[in-house]
Structures are given as C-alpha cells and as structure tokens.
Amino acid sequence: MNKALVLSLISIAGMSPASQASQVLNGYWAYQEFLNEFPEQKHLTDALAAAVRDDPVPIAPEKRHPLKISVVYPGQQISDYWIRNIDAFEKRLDKLNIDYQINQVFTRPNADIKQQSLSLMEALKSNSDYLIFTLDTTRHRKFVEHVLDSTKTKLILQNITTPVREWETRQPFMYVGFDHAEGSRELAVEFGKQFPKNTHYSVLYFSEGYISDIRGNTFIHQVNQDSQFELQSAYYTKATKQSGYEAAKASLKKYPDVEFIYACSTDVALGAVEALSELGREDVMINGWGGGSAELDAILKGELDITVMRMNDDTGIAMAEAIKWDLEGKPVPTVYSGDFEVVTKSDSPERIEALRKRAFRYSDN
C-alpha cells in the first residue's frame, strides 16, 4: 500500500474512507496561476482588494436602481463564516447606498440538496439580478452550468477562488472566498516547523467534494513532499462536529501513534477536540480551519493548537464592491481571495483580539 496515503478501512456513521488523493486542483485554475495567466485580471483583483481595504464610497445617485439579490448558503454549522459573510455584505451595501432586496436561505452543508435545489429554482424564477451560491459537489456544478447557460442572473460563487477551466468562455460574474490551497499551505508550513521528518499523522476531511480535495489534498501533498510526513489514515466526514468526533476516535483506535490530526473544517476540528479530550490524548496536535469565533475561543482555552484565520469580512465587502462596480459599468475581476493569518495557542490574547477586530470589522458591529 502506498505510504503516501494509507487509508483507513473502517467506515462508521456514514463516513466513507477516502479512496485516494485525487490530483489537487484537477480541472481548476489555481488562484495565482489564473492571475499570472491573465494579467488584466490581476490588475482588476488588486484594484478590488484596495477597495475592500478602503472606506466605502457611496454610489452616484444616477447609477442606483433597485436590485434583487438571492443568497443560498450552507450556514447551519458551528463555523460562523457564512453568517458573518452575509452580514458584512449587507452592511457594506448599505454604506455604498445601494438599493437592494435580499432573499436568504441557509442550509446545512452536505445535506438539504432538495431544499437547495428548490431555493435555487425559486431565485431564478424571481429573476434575481444576482445569485450568491457555492460550488462543492457535482450537483452544485450542474445547477451552476444551467444558470450560466440559460439565465440573465449574475452568479457569484462563494468560498471558491479557483476558476473552472471548462467554463473559460462563460465564467460566473465572480468567484470570491479565501483560497483554500493557500490556507492549507500555510498550515503545512507551520506543521513542518513543529515536527521532525517522518512524523505520522491523520487527516479528517470535510464531506466529499471540492473543499476536501483542495484543503485536504493540498496539505497532504505539501507535508509529504516538504517534510516527508507519513499519512496513516484519511476519513471523509459528514462535515459535522459529531462525524469529526467519531472519525477521530476511529482513526486513533487504528493508528494510535499519530503526532497530529489535520482537520479540514471548524466543525470537524471541534469534534476531534472532544474525542482527544475523552481519550486523554492531548498529546495529539489538532488544527482548526478558518479562525471563526468558535475556533478563536478554543485556541484561547488551549483546546485547539493552531488555525489559519480568514479575515472574514473581506469577502462580504468584496461582493458589495463588485456589485457597485457592475452598476457603474466598470469591469469586475473574475476572482478575489481575502487575506489569512496563522494563529496559535501561544499567541497573546492581545494579538488574537486585534485580528478578531480586523476580521470582523463589519459583522461584529
């Protein structure tokens, strides 16, 4: 069996062991690769990043007209990324003096596909000007292609910053998020500093799909190549705290000698934290992914060791600014990624609080 990816054969609570690490970013442009290939896009992305950092400049009255915006998000999870994101989006729209009506539907990740489909079809029937959605599964992709091919609704894909190569001539209005590959590489570098070569570790994926591929497989590739770490097991979960708890227990039962567990999401990480505590395995290092409120609290308590923290509100602000540019007739970048900061349990409460204020500058007010 290939030691680069030793996969657990246990399957519990609906979790399927990962069959193999698929080629990272197969079928997608990597974020920096896309910007390097299309210099005009890099110029637009840099300009949008500057607008995100700047104070809002209200739209000229003659450019205003009522907008209908639909949002379908997987918001029902411990991670507060999605809820904060839409909050920052609305507050920036208000400060830009944009006239809008918004319809929100929050669903659970890896569930409620029927509810998502109904909500998405409703958004199209209502002739929304903009539809904000995500792209994680094959079913999402089929719906997105339907929107791109047959409607005038402008599609903003959230939580993805890697343009789909096949859509070269019909890309969505914008991809926006925090580059999963970059965040995973930053964590890989930090783990490489913490542990010697040939360290044993396990991976707890998100549910099967894009996020697991990018966050999980990017990390695996990086630490195996740079640090010669040895992967012992990898589990797909249901993207919930409970499935993270169960996967961590199963993994440690079969491979008790791991030095750390790499978790691909907040909910999965916090479930693993609970399992480690119950098993008395505080010697096993565990990361978070995203640095939302729940993760920062866990780091301050010493329950999580490390996370890569998104400057959360950047993406909500970026969507609002992009819509303003569109109303003004300006070109909008195809892709935008917000900033990350690595946070560890050795960081001072003062540094963590400063990062919290920066990341949540709209959604906390």
From Swiss-Prot:
<dbReference type="GO" id="GO:0042597">
    <property type="term" value="C:periplasmic space"/>
</dbReference>
<dbReference type="Pfam" id="PF13407">
    <property type="entry name" value="Peripla_BP_4"/>
</dbReference>
<keyword id="KW-0732">Signal</keyword>
<feature type="signal peptide">
    <location>
        <begin position="1"/>
        <end position="21"/>
    </location>
</feature>
<keyword id="KW-0574">Periplasm</keyword>
<dbReference type="InterPro" id="IPR025997">
    <property type="entry name" value="SBP_2_dom"/>
</dbReference>
<dbReference type="InterPro" id="IPR028082">
    <property type="entry name" value="Peripla_BP_I"/>
</dbReference>
<protein>
    <recommendedName>
        <fullName>Autoinducer 2-binding periplasmic protein LuxP</fullName>
    </recommendedName>
</protein>
<dbReference type="GO" id="GO:0000976">
    <property type="term" value="F:transcription cis-regulatory region binding"/>
</dbReference>
<comment type="function">
    <text>Binds to the signaling molecule autoinducer 2 (AI-2), a furanosyl borate diester, (3a-methyl-5,6-dihydrofuro-[2,3d][1,3,2]dioxaborole-2,2,6,6a-tetraol). This complex then interacts with the LuxQ sensor protein.</text>
</comment>
<dbReference type="GO" id="GO:0003700">
    <property type="term" value="F:DNA-binding transcription factor activity"/>
</dbReference>
<comment type="similarity">
    <text>Belongs to the bacterial solute-binding protein 2 family.</text>
</comment>
